[in-house]
């Protein structure tokens, strides 16, 4: 169920929930849920995107050491392609909350909608900049996913995954067109689908139409 609450009145056993990886063309969407310990404040919490990599790595360890409990979850590429990215994200958030070793009294979700949970929940727009527990969740999710992207770069070299983290940068799009999609690319995303169809046409001996400017008499 979802409730509209005055967040300033909520103190103990509030879980913050956030995700990383909705926009990339490859890799899982990663989520985290965190219940902070009011007796062990963590200085410097903020939206993970506003922190340096070194600061995120430091806070990643501190959050895991000081939080009452935390859990990192995910939805795989196959689930993203089957469900769509929104529903896969909601599923991953649900898994994160359900994975907590302590049942929260309330789950505050970054964004404008909540997954279906067995505990009260409420969305908080830009919550990773407003709610410490959501900021903590954003850090756990981002550091986890960034580390995974660095590891996948070793398995799938040539795409620059460690740098762009799977987002549709010019470098990534060029590599995708040149090399074709890997098993970790999301086939339901337009640029990946286009690259996949182009590679399939080549494998079948078909031809890919050239832009008009490249055609010669």
UniProtKB/Swiss-Prot annotation:
It catalyses: Endonucleolytic cleavage to 5'-phosphomonoester. GO terms for molecular function: manganese ion binding; RNA binding; RNA-DNA hybrid ribonuclease activity. The gene is rnhB. One of its GO terms (biological process) is DNA replication, removal of RNA primer. Its cofactor is Mn(2+); Mg(2+). One of its GO terms (cellular component) is ribonuclease H2 complex. Manganese or magnesium. Binds 1 divalent metal ion per monomer in the absence of substrate. May bind a second metal ion after substrate binding. It is an enzyme of class 3 (hydrolase). A divalent metal cation binds at residues 18-19, 110. Keywords: Cytoplasm, Endonuclease, Hydrolase, Manganese, Metal-binding, Nuclease. Gene3D superfamilies: Ribonuclease H-like superfamily/Ribonuclease H. Its EC number is 3.1.26.4. Residues 12-201 form the RNase H type-2 domain. It comes from the Bacteria. Belongs to the RNase HII family. It is found in: Cytoplasm. InterPro entries: RNase_HII, RNase_HII/HIII, RNase_HII/HIII_dom, RNaseH-like_sf, RNaseH_sf. This is Ribonuclease HII. Pfam families: RNase_HII (PF01351). Endonuclease that specifically degrades the RNA of RNA-DNA hybrids. HAMAP family: RNase_HII_B.
């Amino acid at each position: 169920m979802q409730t509209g609450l005055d967040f300033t009145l909520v103190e103990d056993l509030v879980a913050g929930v956030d995700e990383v990886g909705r926009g990339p063309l490859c890799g899982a969407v990663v989520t985290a849920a965190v219940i902070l310990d009011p007796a062990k404040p963590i200085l410097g919490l903020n939206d993970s995107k506003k922190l340096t990599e070194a600061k995120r790595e430091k806070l990643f360890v501190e959050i895991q050491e000081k939080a009452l409990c935390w859990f990192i979850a995910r939805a795989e590429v196959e689930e993203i392609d089957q469900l769509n990215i929104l529903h896969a994200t909601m599923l991953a958030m649900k898994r994160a909350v359900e994975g907590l070793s302590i049942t929260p009294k309330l789950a505050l979700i970054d964004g404008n909608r909540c997954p279906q949970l067995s505990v009260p929940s409420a969305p908080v727009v830009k919550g990773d900049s407003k709610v410490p527990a959501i900021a903590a969740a954003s850090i756990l999710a981002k550091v986890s996913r960034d580390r995974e992207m660095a590891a996948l770069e070793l398995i799938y070299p040539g795409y620059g995954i460690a740098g762009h983290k799977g987002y549709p940068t010019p470098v990534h799009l060029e590599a995708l067109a040149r090399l074709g999609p890997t098993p970790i690319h999301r086939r339901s995303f337009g640029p990946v689908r286009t690259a996949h169809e182009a590679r399939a046409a080549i494998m079948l001996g078909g031809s890919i139409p050239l832009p008009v400017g490249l055609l010669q008499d």
